[in-house]
Regions:
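Membrane-embedded alpha-helical bundles of multi-pass integral membrane proteins
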Residues: 1-211, 220-223
Length: 225
């Protein structure tokens, strides 16, 4: 990939870093998957912390803090700083869904998944589920929420789309929220020559979130893969 000389120094630095780091994406995603398993899967196996326990002295509280006090805030902060690079490079659910898709049935995406209200419905259902079970206070409930979401991402990726991230575009519970924050992102990728007509949806191109790249105007669906 050639980096044009007329770009700003910052833009060229970001592009060069992204191109050079792409060969390490699989390793990064594998590490993030391991972190996900530890942060989500280990706390339910540990005993309940005593009343006098602290974050630094109790592994359950420490992992709980990593999930809700570090992981989630950094996801939203990263979107503001770098766009949705979390979704395309770091998210273990998106990576697992994409991997499942490469070995899956790759069926056409049904209309009910493409419905504009599907992401909002997904967000509402997951939020109500999490609040009802108290996922922030009960590690088992958190493991059920995130583990179930991971399973759904894999199943939907295995069933539908051809080399696409159907889960990320249409079904991720926080995808639209991150898309809203990405409008503030300091880093965005745009076509060098943009065609007229505004943003368009297409399953024919190489974009995993079905963006018609030559007509791309917005960053909300771009996962910076």
């Amino acid at each position: 990939i050639e980096i044009p000389e007329d770009r700003s120094a910052f833009t060229r630095a970001v592009e060069t870093m992204a191109v050079g780091a792409k060969r390490h994406f699989a390793l990064v995603q594998l590490v993030m998957f391991g972190v996900f398993l530890v942060v989500v899967g280990v706390p339910p196996l540990l005993p309940d912390p005593p009343a006098e326990a602290t974050i630094l002295g109790d592994p359950t509280l420490f992992l709980k803090y990593l999930l809700w006090g570090v992981w989630f805030p950094l996801v939203f902060l990263s979107v503001i700083l770098f766009g949705r690079i979390w979704c395309g490079v770091l998210c273990p659910m998106g990576a697992a869904s994409e991997l499942a898709n490469t070995h899956g049935l790759q069926r056409p995406i049904p209309g009910w998944i493409k419905w504009e209200g599907t992401p909002a419905l997904s967000f509402i259902v997951m939020t109500l589920y999490g609040q009802t079970l108290g996922v922030r206070d009960h590690p088992g409930a958190a493991a059920g929420l995130f583990g179930g979401t991971m399973l759904l991402a894999i199943v939907f990726g295995w069933l539908w789309g051809r080399n696409k991230r159907v889960w990320c575009r249409h079904l991720c519970p926080i995808g639209r929220v991150l898309g809203l924050y990405s409008r503030l992102g300091a880093v965005q990728f745009t076509p060098k020559v943009r065609l007229a007509g505004g943003d368009a949806y297409t399953e024919r191109g190489i974009c995993p979130t079905m963006i018609d790249l030559p007509r791309k105007c917005e960053s909300r669906h771009c996962i910076e893969c």
